[in-house]
Amino acid sequence: MASSNLIKQLQERGLVAQVTDEEALAERLAQGPIALYCGFDPTADSLHLGHLVPLLCLKRFQQAGHKPVALVGGATGLIGDPSFKAAERKLNTEETVQEWVDKIRKQVAPFLDFDCGENSAIAANNYDWFGNMNVLTFLRDIGKHFSVNQMINKEAVKQRLNREDQGISFIEFSYNLLQGYDFACLNKQYGVVLQIGGSDQWGNITSGIDLTRRLHQNQVFGLTVPLITKADGTKFGKTEGGAVWLDPKKTSPYKFYQFWINTADADVYRFLKFFTFMSIEEINALEEEDKNSGKAPRAQYVLAEQVTRLVHGEEGLQAAKRITECLFSGSLSALSEADFEQLAQDGVPMVEMEKGADLMQALVDSELQPSRGQARKTIASNAITINGEKQSDPEYFFKEEDRLFGRFTLLRRGKKNYCLICWK
């Protein structure tokens, strides 16, 4: 992605919600490489899909020759950003936040190159400059530059102030000052001149721009990426089970892959622009091919492959594809023990059972059938498979060979209704 027209290219992909002084920023980018940053607060032990667009934006800038700084908010994570939140966040302990900082730093690392010469990425933590700052320094050096009038007029704060059931505490009100100071610190320390973030960060970003100008007399810029929405109006990045996480222990690579496979046709080409590094020309060609093929579109598979590889690597992608293929074909011989552990985690419904159970009881316990009587009829109708093999004996008791890896048995009713038995 060429640096000189990088902003235009991001706009073509729909990746720019707002930008401060676009003309001046374009001029600055045309002069040569810049340093830029994006912040990630440790409000959980993993990043989720909502973090992926700004994180990939950092990567896009690095590919164009710029120097990315990934800032993990060890200090701001102790406070909690109130921006557009309906209620105050629960405060977490320092130990918990530090543990989350370490996890998030490790999650961010594979997306950026920390050893590529002049534009090698930097990992920073704002606890380094806030950890030992006393309250008088904070008030005199930072607080004096902020107008309360302007702060309460920021949309994110206004929404909270106008809620009868929820005001805003001083601790959250001060978050804006902390994030603003991050920008000023990174500008002084690393020459950072651009902050990128989600569109909910606009107020915090503009505060940082103002503070940097006041403290260092430097012009800096802000760019926000849009809040990702789906064509049907439902929230992006959520499933019935909650958020889609980047940590494979919280959302398995198989579940992650399936999330993208299930993208609606109305969203898939837009999401290819947001979440992959395919060129606009390649995406348009794929859309044209899908339109004229007369078959199911290929775009969802391309999207699922590209994003799963980005987040979980080639090994995670191959495991996800292997599990998908085995569930579709009914043949489980290619599945490893680790694959079954993914299924047990979140891939299919799971039930724990004691050894010695019969098939009818397993169907009831797994909620594949409402009663033993109904289970008996379904088994007799040849609609049940055990590990891909048909079983039509209602009196069937599980055998040792049904326990794959000594632990797992996969039941299927009909073509699509699965349950994994994990034997105690």
From Swiss-Prot:
L-tyrosine binds at Y37, Y175, Q179. ATP binds at K238. GO terms for cellular component: cytosol. InterPro entries: aa-tRNA-synth_I_CS, aa-tRNA-synth_Ic, Rossmann-like_a/b/a_fold, S4_RNA-bd, S4_RNA-bd_sf, SYY-like_C, Tyr-tRNA-ligase, Tyr-tRNA-ligase_bac-type. The modification N6-acetyllysine is found at K144. A motif ('KMSKS' region) lies at residues 235-239. GO terms for biological process: tyrosyl-tRNA aminoacylation. SMART domains: S4 (SM00363). It catalyses: tRNA(Tyr) + L-tyrosine + ATP = L-tyrosyl-tRNA(Tyr) + AMP + diphosphate + H(+). Keywords: Acetylation, Aminoacyl-tRNA synthetase, ATP-binding, Cytoplasm, Ligase, Nucleotide-binding, Protein biosynthesis, RNA-binding. It comes from the Bacteria. A motif ('HIGH' region) lies at residues 42-51. It is found in: Cytoplasm. Catalyzes the attachment of tyrosine to tRNA(Tyr) in a two-step reaction: tyrosine is first activated by ATP to form Tyr-AMP and then transferred to the acceptor end of tRNA(Tyr). Belongs to the class-I aminoacyl-tRNA synthetase family. TyrS type 1 subfamily. Homodimer. PANTHER family: TYROSINE--TRNA LIGASE, MITOCHONDRIAL, TYROSYL-TRNA SYNTHETASE. This is Tyrosine--tRNA ligase. It comes from Shigella dysenteriae serotype 1 (strain Sd197). The gene is tyrS.
